[in-house]
Amino acid sequence: AQCLVGSEMCIRDKAKRITVPVSLDFMSVSSYGSDTKSSGVVKIVKDLDESLKDKEVIVVEDIVDSGRTLSYLLEMLKDRGPASLRLCTLLDKPERRVIDVHVDYTGFNIPDEFVVGYGLDYDQRYRNLPYIGVVEFD
């Protein structure tokens, strides 16, 4: 199996409990920039190092919001020929969904609030917090 990671902190914690051989590969995809809302423009910041051809793939994401970024990403990854492609997310905001994205494994459904910590950031800050908190804007 191969995992693609949106939330490095999450997968590092979970990898300690995985008892089967896996290959971890990291990909960085962004549609936020320095804003709190998705721009809708998907940017591949870092692509995968390994081929997905005929592999069982689980995309591990920190948060699923509008679905725009993940819809684009999942379609792109399907074109690379994996045997299967599943999506796991720590946090899901289903009420924010603009594009239908099927999430196979969800940690927590959360309301439409901007959250930081445990790998999630606001303008590259607060990623290091050992918990997830809500940012309140005035």
Where are these regions (language model features)?
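Single conserved hydrophobic/aromatic residue that forms the stacking wall/gate
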Residues: 1-6
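Active-site loops and adjacent core secondary-structure elements that bind or stabilize anionic groups
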Residues: 9-10
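Active-site signature of alpha/beta-hydrolase-fold catalytic machinery across serine-
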Residues: 13, 72, 76
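Short helix-capping segments at alpha-helix termini
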Residues: 17-21, 80-81
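Short, glycine/charge-rich flexible loops or terminal/linker lids adjacent to PRPP-binding catalytic cores
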Residues: 21-57, 66-72, 99
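Residue-level marker for buried hydrophobic side chains located in beta-strands
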Residues: 58-59, 118
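PRPP-dependent phosphoribosyltransferase catalytic core
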Residues: 75, 79-138
